[in-house]
Amino acid sequence: IFDVTDETAVKESVKVVENQIGDQKLSGLINNAGLGVMGTIQSLSAEQFKYQFDVNVLGVFHCCQAYLDLLGADKNRKGDPGKIINISSVSGEIGMPFMSAYNMSKFGLEGFSEGIRRELLMYGIDVVVIAPGPIKTPIWKKINQKDEVKRYDNSDFRESLARAMKMTDKMEQVGFEPIVIAERALSIIESKKNNTRYRIDPTRMQNILLQLFPKRIADRMIAKRMNIIRK
C-alpha cells in the first residue's frame, strides 16, 4: 500500500513488483486510487481542487510513468506487453453540479488516457479506460454531509447541495458491487483484443439520454432535479 501522490513511494513499489516478476513483463497496471470532493464554485478552495487533481490524475501519471519499463518499454524483458487500465467515471463525460472538482479530474484522466494510448502503440502497451457509474463504495461518505451542508446555511445553494448529497447516497444503493469492476479489469488483462473504453453503469440509459439531449435542455433537467432555481 502506498500514496500515489508520493512519487518516491510509487518508485519504491516498482522495486517490490520487479522482485516478484524477475525478467518478465508485467501483465497489467490498474490505476484505481481516487477520491471525490463536493461543493460549489463559491466555496471550494484551490487546495481542494489541487488535492483532487493530485490523486485522480497526477497519481495515475506517476504510476504509468514508473511502471512503463516493466510493462514493456524495456524490450529486454520477456513476454507480451502489459496493459494499463485507468478507472475513470461517467463523471469524465457528464458534468454535474457541485462536482466540478471531481469532473475536472475525471475529464482530465480521460484525455490523459487517450493521449498515452496513442503514444504507447510504440511498445504495444494497450491503455483501456473503465468508466463506472455508481459503485457501492464509500467515496462520498467520507464527506461529513451535515457539516458540509451547514457551511451553506446562508447560501443560495444550501437546499440544492443537500439534495445533491442525498442523491449520491441513493446512487450508491443502486450501484454495482466493486467486484464487477475487478472482474472486468481482469478480463481486459487476459484478453488479446479490447475496446478502448468500457462504461459499467447501472444508470446507463439515463446518462445516455442526458448526452443525447441538447445541452440547454439537459441543463434545465438537471437543475430541476437538484432544485437549482434562479433567485
Feature map (PLM): residue ranges:
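Active-site loop immediately N-terminal to the catalytic Tyr-X3-Lys motif
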Residues: Q42, I94-S100
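Substrate-binding pocket helix/loop in short-chain dehydrogenase/reductase
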Residues: T40-I41, Q48-K50
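The beta1-alpha1 cofactor-binding region of Rossmann-like NAD(H)/NADP(H)-dependent oxidoreductases
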Residues: I1-E12, A46
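Active-site helix of classical SDR
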Residues: C64, S105
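C-terminal beta-strand-loop-alpha-helix "lid" module of Rossmann-like NAD(P)-dependent dehydrogenases
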Residues: E119-E172
